[in-house]
Amino acid sequence: PPPDRHTLDLDSLAFPDGARTMTNKRCDLPPGSFRAQHKGYEEVHVPALAPPAMDDGEALKKIDDLPEWARPAFKGMATLNRVQSRVCDAALFGTSNLLLCAPTGAGKTNVAMLTILQQVGLHRRPDGSVDGSAFKCVYIAPMKALVAEQTANLAKRLAPYGLTVRELTGDSNLTRAELDAASVVVATPEKWDIVTRRAGGDRA
């Protein structure tokens, strides 16, 4: 049998104030905020949130406390930040999967560096050099511009280990030999999906 039909009164569901609900001029600002009127515009100053207090026993990880071989990747830094310090041991010494959710600017790139160094530590030779052919790390960035930026950043920081970092996007193809020789590949999700689905071939 056909389904029952009902009449829906859309007018009864509309906001009583119409579009004016989207232009509410009232805004409760946090303590310490102020407004200043200028010619042609209004300035609203909202102070930055203070970071929450450190937990008991919580401390920032000093770069000098990292293994000596890991320190060159953090040249110019004195400590890791709070997010990085909390996951440092899991990223640098752990072997389990790691899922990190942190806001923009929280330092996720340095956490990624710690995970790369985990592989560096596993493949150090007795003389201190690194066997870069024994592992491959894939760094996924959402946009081509970020891929180029992170490739340059990682290449500079991993240079002391003799590791090759290559960029892989729709604008930069790699030969199979170049891809095999890279210890770290920085790619967009779309390009890496294409590469991993492709069977064989001389170019990636």
Model-predicted segments: where are they?
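Helicase-associated low-complexity/disordered flanking segments
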Residues: 1-89, 95-99, 128-129, 134
